[in-house]
Amino acid sequence: MIAYENIEFFICLVNVLGNNMYNILFFIFLSIAIPFLLFLAWKQHLKTKEIRSYLLKEGYNIIFNGEGNSYLAFNISNATFRAGNLTSNDYFQASISYIHDYRWEWKEVEAKKINNIFIIYISNIDFPSQKLFYRNNKSLAEIDWAKLQAIFHQPYEIQNDVMQDNNNTHYDFFISHAKEDKDTFVRPLVDELNRLGVIIWYDEQTLEVGDSLRRNIDLGLRKANYGIVILSHNFLNKKWTQYELDSLINRAVYDDNKIILPIWHNINAQEVSKYSHYLADKMALQTSLYSVKEIARELAEIAYRRR
C-alpha cells in the first residue's frame, strides 16, 4: 500500500514539475522572442525612414506604397521613377515613358469599393509591374489615383520632351513585313510588343494620311535600333520589302551591333538561303517553334539591353 502511494506521489510530482517546466520554457521563449521582434521592427522602421529621406533628397517627392514594403516614387523634374523596397537599397529606375499602362481594379460590395488595387505596368522583363494596395480605404485610393493620373497627364516640359515629342522619337524596332502576314502574325506580335512597352515603327500605328511612305520608311529605318525582318513566302515575293531589307543590310555593314533580327514565318532554312545567304547565316526566331508571346519577350529583352 505504501509503495502504491509513493508511486502516485511520484507521478503527481512529475506532472507538476512538467507543467512548471513547460511554463518556464515558454516564458523564457517569450522573453527572448518579443524583444527580438521589437528590435527587428525598429530596425525596419529606421531603414524605411532612411530610404524615404533619400528618395526625397533625390527629388522623388511623390511616393506610393505598394504591397508589403514595396514603393513606386516619381521625380517630376526629370520625368523618372523608381520602384523598389523600403527595407532594401535595391531599386529599378527608368524614364516615366517605361510605364506603358496603369489601371485601378477593385471589388464592389454594397456600393462600396473594397480591395482596391492599382496595377502599374513597367517595360522591364525582370520588373514587369508594380501593385499598390489600398484594401477598403476608398478615400486614400481616390486621392492617390488622382495623383497618379496627374503624373501622366500634366503638361510639364520635361515629360513632354521624353514622352510626346514625336519628331525626336527613337524606335527600338523597325518591322519589315509583307502586308499579307499582318493578320496571321505581325499584328499580334506588335500588340504584344506594345504591351511590353517596346517602341516600334509599324506602318499601321506610325503613318498618317498624307504622309510620304518612302520618306517615313527611310526615317524609321534610320531611327530604329534594330530591324525585325519577318521572312515568309509573301515577304520573298515583294519588291518593297527588298528595299527595306537592303537599307538594313547597308546599316548592318557599318554597325557593330546586330542590326537585323530575322523571324522565320512558315518558311525553312533552304528557302531563306535561296533568297539571301546573309539572312540564312543569322540566328532567327521561328514561328513554328515559338509562340507570339515568347518571340515578343525575346525581342523586348534585346530592346531593353540596348536602351
From Swiss-Prot:
UniProt-annotated location(s): Secreted; Membrane
GO biological process terms, semicolon-separated: NAD catabolic process; negative regulation of MyD88-dependent toll-like receptor signaling pathway; signal transduction
Stored PROSITE patterns: TIR
Membrane topology: Single-pass membrane protein
Broad class of where this protein is predominantly found: secreted
GO CC list: extracellular region; membrane
The entry's keywords: Hydrolase, Membrane, NAD, Secreted, Transmembrane, Transmembrane helix, Virulence
InterPro entries xrefs: TIR_dom, Toll_tir_struct_dom_sf
Transmembrane segments: 22-42
Active site, UniProt feature: 244
EC number: 3.2.2.6, 3.2.2.-
Domain of life: Bacteria
Complexes and interactors: Interacts with host MYD88. Interacts with host TLR4.
Protein purpose: Virulence factor that suppresses host Toll-like receptor (TLR)-mediated cytokine production upon infection, thereby increasing bacterial burden in the urinary tract and promoting renal tissue damage. Acts as a NAD(+) hydrolase (NADase) by catalyzing cleavage of NAD(+) into ADP-D-ribose (ADPR) and nicotinamide. Also able to hydrolyze NADP(+), but not other NAD(+)-related molecules.
Comment block on domains: The TIR domain mediates NAD(+) hydrolase (NADase) activity. Self-association of TIR domains is required for NADase activity.
Name assigned to this protein: NAD(+) hydrolase TcpC
Source organism of the structure: Escherichia coli O6:H1 (strain CFT073 / ATCC 700928 / UPEC)
